Structure formats: structure tokens, C-alpha cells
């Protein structure tokens, strides 16, 4: 089973790089078993939240972790005998069967990706982080969306919004009718019942908060403060609010109620007309200002374009005013400029010659320096090439040793095919033995039937002859004794076969129990029981220490 254990170790190392490989599964500790099984279950079912490590100390926590992993394996479809003892007291046979099942249940996409990648290369921290991010995003995409106001505190923390930011801005023009219906007329009551918006509608149409608006209205009613007309106009222009409802006494008439409302309506209409007039005038002035600005821009561009030509014409007119004198001045200026140019050319040649010589020297020095640098680089590259060649030879030697010590994948595949061929051959041999056994059983049945018929026929003949002949009577007794002895022999042979079969079954069970390391498991169970007893004694001492002060008081 060494090759099977190596294959299992290789697959587990691909699942979780933190699992330290061992030579055989019998050397697996409970902590390694828990980490390997939890890693495989996490790959099979990413939604499962299983512990990755086995806690130390408290046995109750260890039993809980082992039981949860056993339940996860059962949910994944494992039909074998599994429980907390499989993880706390592992044996090689059951552990091998469990890990082979989990490796077969791994996703095919992951296995194909691993086959294409290098098996000896472990995942980097960046790849592990990307895998974790993909799992988190997949888990968040599977969760249903819940609005923020319907989330509990725990759910908010899970979904990344531990608090809600609400702007408590009041609606200062909130309209709340009085609680006494006798103070309102029939028309006002009808308006409030059918047309007036309620508190929720007044605050829902804007960014104002309901609680803040009600508190603000209560403060206004408490201190009997009224808003000015300018404030009301500002609020009306910012966000529309329902018209205020004036409360009147029951003894007022309908004409007195309508007069202030009509006056306010007329004032509002006049202000609206004035506002529209001012807006129209403002638009007309804005159009005129835009046209003037455009004309100003065009004029500035035209002036900028004409200004150089104007300066040129001014200079030309100044020169043409006294042409002979200006021509003489220009000739003198031209001669002085030529002599100055010749002088400057000579000075430049005197200054340029040493500079050219120094430039040639610098170029030569730079080329020599570059050649020296190239030679140094060549020497350095040769040294690196020698080092790389030596390292390549060392790695080749290591690869040869590794290939000699560890069988490659093809060798594993070849051995697996050999195992399968041997199993098929054994199965064919078993079928052949079963066929031979059936044929032999048929022959035995035929021979037994023939013997039974011959015995019955002989028994009848001897029985008829025994009535008249003494020798026939003695032969009949010997025949009966022979038949009884033959039956005893057949029973003895059957009992011998059953005993041999039971002996073989017991030998197989003994071999299986030897592989389970019963003695080691019993020692671990004894140690765990002692830890439980020690923990119980500590709890009893704590209870006594708590009860003694209470008894003294």
C-alpha cells in the first residue's frame, strides 16, 4: 500500500499545502487527519463551514469537531463506518478508505487544472488570496438580497454594513391637523379626509425625516413660534409642501373664512405674475449681454490680426520719409554688420577648435570605457554561465536521484494498471473456482442420488430375503450399519469444511484487527478518560469553593 499512500499524500498536498507529507498513512496524527478531511470537504462543498484544526486541551471541543467532520463526510455520500473515533483514534485501513473516497469526490475542474500545472510547485500567497476572494464572491452572490432596514445587527455585520447613516433633516412646513374635530368645519374635515396628504406622504416626497419633522412641529407648537413670510417663500421654492389649513372657531361664518384665503390667493397670483415678468426681462437681458460679448470677442480678434500689419506700415512710412539718408545709414549698418560677422566668425573658429579636440578626446575615452565595460560584462556573464551550468548539473543529478527514489506518475499508472490486471485475473480465477465448485456439487448430487437409489434397492432386496434367510438378515444389519457410518463420515467432512472456513474468517479478522492498532487506540482512549476525570475533579473543586462561602453565610 506504499504506492497508494504516496498518491493520497500527493493529492492532499495539492488540496492543502500546509499538510506535511509522511511515508505512510499510519503516521498521520489526529490533527493532520482533521486538516486533510476538512480541506477535502471544503473543496467538495464550499458552503460548508467546518473547522480546519483540532483544538487542544478540552476533550468536549475535540469530540464536537470530530463529530461535525463525521457528519460532513456522511452528507457527502460516504457509506462506511465513521464517527468521532475515526479522527481521534485513526487507523490506516479506515483512513485510507475515507481519503480515497474524498479524493474521488473532488471537483473534476480542479483536478484537470492541477494535471495541467506543475505538481511540484506550491500555491503562492497571491493565488491563495485570489482563491479566497473567488469563494467569498461566489458565496455572497448566492445569498439573497435584503434591504438595509430589514437586516438584523448580525446580518448587517455579515453583509458589511454594521450601521445605517440617516440624515435627520426636518420638514419645517409640516402640516398636522388638530386632534379635536370640533374645531374644524365640514369643508376642512372633508379636505383632510380626502385630499390632504398624511404625515408619511409629506415626508416621503422629500429628503426630510418623519421623526425629526414631528419633533420640530411639536417644538413650534410648544413655544408658539411662527415662521416669517420670507422663510415660507424660501421653503416653497426649495421643495413643495401642502398648503396650511387655517383653524376657525365654530361660530364664524363661511364668508369670513373665505376672505383671508382669497386675499392670500390674490397676493400669490400677483407675485407669480411679477416673478414671470422679471424672469422674461432677465432672459431678454441675458440674450443681449451674450450678443454683446460675442461682438466684443470678434472685435478683439480683428484688432489682434490687424495690429502687426499696422506696425509694419508705420515703419515703412518712416523709412520712406527720407530715403537717401536712410539708405546711407542702411549701407553703413550693413558694412559694420559684415565686419562684425567676420570678427565673430574668427572668434568662433578660435573657440571651436579646442572644443572639437576635447570632444574627440572625450569620445575616444568614452569608447574605451564602453569597451572596458563590455569586457567586464562578458567576464561576469561567463562567470554566471559557469555557475548556472554547475547548478544545472546539480539539478540534473538531483532529478536523477529523485526519479530513482520516487516513482514518477507513469510508474504509478503502470502499477495501478498492474493492480487492476491482477484483480481481473483473481476475479477470473474466482469465477473459475466457483464454476468448478458448482460442477463438483452437481456431480456429488448425482452420485449421492445414485447411491441413495442403490441403497434403497439393496435395502428392499435384503429386507425381503431376511425374512427367510439368516445370512440375508445378517447382511441387512451390516448394510444398515454401513449406511449409518457413511452418514457419520459425510457429517464429519461437512463439519471439517465449516471449521476450516471459520478458521480462515477468523484469520482475516485477526489480520484486520492487527492493522487497526487496537493497543494504541486503547492507550489513547485511556488517556482521554483520565483527562475527563481530571477535568471533572477540577469542576467539583470549583463547585466546593463556591458552595463553602455560601454555607458560611
UniProtKB/Swiss-Prot annotation:
Q: Which InterPro entries does the record associate with it?
A: CCDC22, CCDC22_CC, CCDC22_N
Annotated spans, Disordered = 236-264
Going by the UniProt record, its keywords in alphabetical order are: Coiled coil
> Coiled coil: which residue ranges?
261-286, 314-407, 498-549
GO BP: positive regulation of ubiquitin-dependent protein catabolic process
Could you state a single Gene Ontology molecular function term? cullin family protein binding
Q: Does the keyword Coiled coil apply?
A: yes
The record ties this protein, via Pfam families, to: CCDC22_CC, CCDC22_N
The entry's family comment says: Belongs to the CCDC22 family.
What this protein is called in its record is Coiled-coil domain-containing protein 22 homolog
Per the UniProt record, the source organism is Drosophila erecta
Amino acid at each position: 500500500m506504499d504506492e497508494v499512500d504516496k498518491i493520497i499524500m500527493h493529492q492532499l498536498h495539492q488540496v492543502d499545502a500546509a499538510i506535511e507529507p509522511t511515508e505512510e498513512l499510519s503516521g498521520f496524527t489526529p490533527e493532520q487527519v482533521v486538516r486533510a478531511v476538512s480541506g477535502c470537504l471544503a473543496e467538495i462543498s464550499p458552503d460548508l463551514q467546518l473547522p480546519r484544526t483540532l483544538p487542544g486541551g478540552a476533550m468536549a471541543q475535540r469530540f464536537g469537531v470530530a463529530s461535525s467532520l463525521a457528519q460532513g463526510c456522511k452528507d457527502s455520500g460516504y457509506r462506511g463506518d465513521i464517527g468521532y473515533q475515526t479522527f481521534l483514534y485513526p487507523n490506516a485501513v479506515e483512513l485510507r478508505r475515507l481519503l480515497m473516497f474524498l479524493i474521488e469526490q473532488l471537483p473534476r475542474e480542479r483536478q484537470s487544472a492541477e494535471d495541467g500545472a506543475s505538481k511540484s510547485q506550491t500555491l503562492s500567497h497571491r493565488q491563495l488570496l485570489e482563491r479566497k476572494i473567488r469563494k467569498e464572491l461566489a458565496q455572497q452572490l448566492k445569498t439573497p438580497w435584503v434591504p438595509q432596514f430589514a437586516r438584523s445587527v448580525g446580518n448587517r455585520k455579515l453583509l458589511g454594513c454594521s450601521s445605517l447613516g440617516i440624515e435627520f433633516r426636518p420638514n419645517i412646513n409640516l402640516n398636522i391637523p388638530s386632534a379635536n374635530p370640533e374645531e374644524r368645519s365640514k369643508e376642512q374635515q372633508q379636505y383632510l379626509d380626502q385630499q390632504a396628504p398624511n404625515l408619511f406622504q409629506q415626508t416621503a416626497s422629500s429628503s426630510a425625516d418623519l421623526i425629526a419633522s414631528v419633533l420640530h412641529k411639536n417644538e413650534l407648537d410648544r413655544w408658539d413660534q411662527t415662521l416669517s413670510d420670507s422663510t415660507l417663500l424660501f421653503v416653497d421654492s426649495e421643495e413643495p409642501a401642502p398648503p396650511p389649513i387655517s383653524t376657525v372657531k365654530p361660530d364664524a361664518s363661511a364668508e369670513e373664512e373665505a376672505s383671508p384665503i382669497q386675499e392670500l390667493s390674490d397676493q400669490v397670483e400677483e407675485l407669480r405674475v411679477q416673478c414671470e415678468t422679471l424672469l422674461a426681462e432677465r432672459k431678454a437681458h441675458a440674450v443681449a449681454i451674450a450678443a454683446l460679448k460675442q461682438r466684443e470677442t470678434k472685435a478683439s480678434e480683428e484688432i489682434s490680426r490687424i495690429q502687426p500689419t499696422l506696425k509694419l506700415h508705420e515703419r515703412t512710412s518712416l523709412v520712406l520719409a527720407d530715403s537717401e539718408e536712410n539708405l546711407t545709414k542702411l549701407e553703413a549698418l550693413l558694412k559694420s554688420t559684415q565686419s562684425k560677422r567676420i570678427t565673430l566668425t574668427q572668434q568662433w573658429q578660435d573657440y571651436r577648435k579646442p572644443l572639437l579636440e576635447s570632444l574627440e578626446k572625450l569620445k575616444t575615452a568614452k569608447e574605451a570605457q564602453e569597451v572596458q565595460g563590455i569586457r567586464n560584462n562578458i567576464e561576469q556573464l561567463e562567470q554566471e554561465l559557469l555557475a548556472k551550468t554547475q547548478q544545472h548539473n546539480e539539478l540534473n543529478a538531483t532529478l536523477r536521484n529523485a526519479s530513482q527514489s520516487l516513482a514518477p506518475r507513469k510508474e504509478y499508472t503502470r502499477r495501478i494498471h498492474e493492480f487492476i490486471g491482477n484483480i481481473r485475473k483473481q476475479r477470473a480465477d474466482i469465477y473459475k473456482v466457483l464454476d468448478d465448485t458448482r460442477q463438483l456439487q452437481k456431480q456429488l448430487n448425482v452420485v449421492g442420488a445414485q447411491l441413495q437409489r442403490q441403497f434403497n434397492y439393496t435395502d428392499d432386496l435384503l429386507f425381503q430375503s431376511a425374512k427367510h434367510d439368516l445370512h440375508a438378515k445378517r447382511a441387512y444389519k451390516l448394510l444398515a450399519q454401513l449406511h449409518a457410518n457413511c452418514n457419520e463420515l459425510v457429517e464429519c467432512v461437512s463439519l471439517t469444511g465449516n471449521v476450516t472456513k471459520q478458521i480462515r474468517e477468523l484469520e482475516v479478522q485477526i489480520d484486520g484487527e492487527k492493522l487497526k492498532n487496537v493497543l494504541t487506540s486503547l492507550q489513547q482512549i485511556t488517556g482521554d478518560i483520565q483527562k475527563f476525570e481530571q477535568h471533572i475533579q477540577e469542576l467539583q473543586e470549583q463547585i466546593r469553593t463556591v458552595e463553602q462561602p455560601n454555607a458560611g453565610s
